[in-house]
Amino acid sequence: MTNYLLEIGLEEIPAHLVTPSINQLAERMETFLKENRLEFDKIIKFSTPRRLAIIVEGLAEASEAIDEEVKGPSAKIAKDAQGNWSKAIQGFSRGQGATPDDLILKGDYYYAKKHIDGVKAEEILSKVGDEVIAKMTFSTYMKWGNNDFLFVRPIQWIVSLLEDKVVAFDLLDVTANRFSRGHRFLANVEVELKNANDYASKMPENFVLVDAEHRKAEISAQILALASENKWQVTLHKDLLEEVNNIVEYPTAFVGSFDPKYLSVPAEVLVTSMRDNQRYFEVYNQEGQLAPNFISVRNGNAENIENVVLGNEKVLVARLEDAEFFWKEDQKLKIEDLVAKLAKVTFHAKIGSITEHMARTKEIAAKLADIAGLTDEEKRDVARSAEIYKFDLLTGMVGEFDELQGVMGEKYALLAGENANVSAAIREHYMPTSAEGELPETKVGSVLAAADKIDSVLSFFNVGLIPSGSNDPYALRRAVQGLIRIIEKMNWHFDLSLFIDQFEGENHLEILDFVKARIQKLLLEKLDRHDIVEAAINSSNFDITNMMESAFVIDGHKLHEPFKPAIENVSRSINLVKKAKDIKEINPTLFEEDAEEALYNVVISLQNQWTYMPGEEKFRAIVHSLAPAIETFFESVMVMAEDLSVRDNRIALLSEVVALTSVMADFSLINTK
């Protein structure tokens, strides 16, 4: 067994592309080796902004030799009327390097036996350039030189070593060899690698920490040490740490500062300037207050670090000056004046202005407020917030720092005298901002956030701007996913189908399918039974909270003994009712068997309390009360009686069973085998 090193040296890769690129390289190499039957133990990944590298450990010296049988023509066409081999069979055997007489008849077909020799690892790996590297795909490409080759960034060098031997191949004008390169500034020289196994130890000697996880741990340790030394609190934000890790090859953390006068600007603005714009880690004092300092990481050593500190401080001060200016100037503006100007700001060319969007949102929010059971005071807050909630889009601060939309709206609203509920709703209506993002905390904010998302989806669908495939330029999938999470968190129960029917539009069925797909996705991230999820999202009314709850409740009982017979009895009822053309009213006087009366009594009893029962209680009632009564009914009663009135009455009884259970799920979609 041997080890193989492949390193692709590049111009600096954008930070957000480094990790997916190295993952793709490893995956493509794994696929390539398996397709070529070249066994290996594992693939180790290395990455920096300037290189993507893997080491394949435990690589076999050659691919496995195999004997295989290749299926050929049918025996029916193998020979002509005179018993001679047909052209079809001759062509097949020739293509397999055999004669017709060498073929084997198995059943109705002829097969050719074929022996495939093993191929040396070196020969297989010489194809890595064309079969692995050249086939990589990226969201962003670059083209260089006089060719049509595209890659994430121009390739500068390639290392290809099988133990101590170069596995040469050419890619454009680059020939794979044993020479890597050190840090661009600290060791800008060729680094000769004698052996593939020297990579992880040799590169740090040239100021390149190629192990991304080790480099990240080093960055974390340095930042925490500086924070401890200065008695600060610091959070190693996951995304920021990942980004910083992917812009450096040799990290050195340092401390910078800014004038405390800027602390008069809201902390969110300062943090945005540092964290989002400059990739700095903000720090807090022991009381949890933002300190006039930051920690950053340079791509290099500590030499002349004081100049680096000064340069970073200068850049930050320029941003903070702008922030302070906007903070002061925006406070001179009036909310009503800004709201009036929104009439001239386009929401979308096909949809209209932001003012029109806000008006529709206000109407939707009023109806949601009723569903949510808000007080009269809360309803007034919903109405007020819906009238003004986009005003901060026209402030200088949001114009400069668009990440602060909503955040600044809340602050400016409070300064203008709006109450806490209205102000918080302005900030919360953007929530959640990501798949797992924070949800609104207030009732008013939840209603406004949901209403804003509903109008966005309705509006874009109504003008035909519907997401397709992976294309979703208006983030409607994210909006719907956020809507689902808000509705579930707030435990709102309403039929979305009936709700959106109150508003204009012709694509409501498409919208419901779109929402249903998002519910399915959310559920399948946590549950492994597709059939249970499918059953829950196909309940008889489009109650999102009910769908989510039902899926988890049913899934929680799937291993219990009564689960299978209960589902089967309910499913049998559903299937019989589906076949019926006309459902009559139940007439208890037509009952002929005790089992009919018993099932009827169970149904009536459950109907009286069904609306108010939690999902867990509903399912227990189905399993322990309804299903046994259904089973006895089927054992004692011939549903398809000769007397049509009796038959119709029994179908009507089963239809009530279906109506009851389908509120929770379509149980006929659950697999019990």
UniProtKB/Swiss-Prot annotation:
Enzyme class of the recorded protein, top EC level: ligase
Segments traversing the membrane: none
SUPFAM superfamilies: HD-domain/PDEase-like (SSF109604)
Coiled coil: none
A single BP term in Gene Ontology: glycyl-tRNA aminoacylation
PANTHER family in the record: GLYCINE--TRNA LIGASE, CHLOROPLASTIC_MITOCHONDRIAL 2, GLYCYL-TRNA SYNTHETASE
Name of protein: Glycine--tRNA ligase beta subunit
Species name: Lactococcus lactis subsp. lactis (strain IL1403) (Streptococcus lactis)
Gene: glyS
